[in-house]
Amino acid sequence: MNAAKRLEIFRRLHEDNPDPKTELGYTTPFELLVAVTLSAQSTDVGVNKATARLFPVANTPHAIYALGVEGLSEYIKTIGLYNSKARNVIEACRLLIERHGGEVPQSREALEALPGVGRKTANVVLNTAFRQPTMAVDTHIFRVSNRTGIAPGKTVLEVEKKLLKFVPKDYLLDAHHWLILHGRYVCQARKPRCGSCRIEDLCEFKQKTSDD
């Protein structure tokens, strides 16, 4: 795919959704960090239901740490792997308090030093909370990048690096959200909705569907 096609793709995505947002509910960087940590192998809808119960009661490192693993588990037990996630969040809260004064750090190294926080989670926090030009490649972004030809790659890291290289700079900060939403609602895994796709004419996917 050439640069002109990529530019037009992101121009259209921006035109349709000028201010894209994550579908996870949050009001602070810490709430976002917790929500993204809980979202592994879970849906945003499921996480939002849990955090809607949790955050009014505890939404700071000190408050969640005070709940303890068992206390936190009661709020998030509807989420998959909630026991291990509760342990990770509690330990992350301890480290945030001890090392960062209860604040969420704005560096990848510091974020990835927290339990339950890998490269993808760190990228989400850096991009969404702190507006850094990072690319959190999840299953949707990986699929869309390969299927459309925007940034094909065999690994998540390869796709991430290509997106950072190829996405036009004016659109880089929001590209993560556009690609996730496009993959979630249009360029779906089993049956892409090519008939209602805004970038269908620019997409390099060979097996396009005729209906939406």
In which residue ranges do the predicted regions lie?
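Catalytic cores of DNA base-excision repair glycosylases
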Residues: 2-212
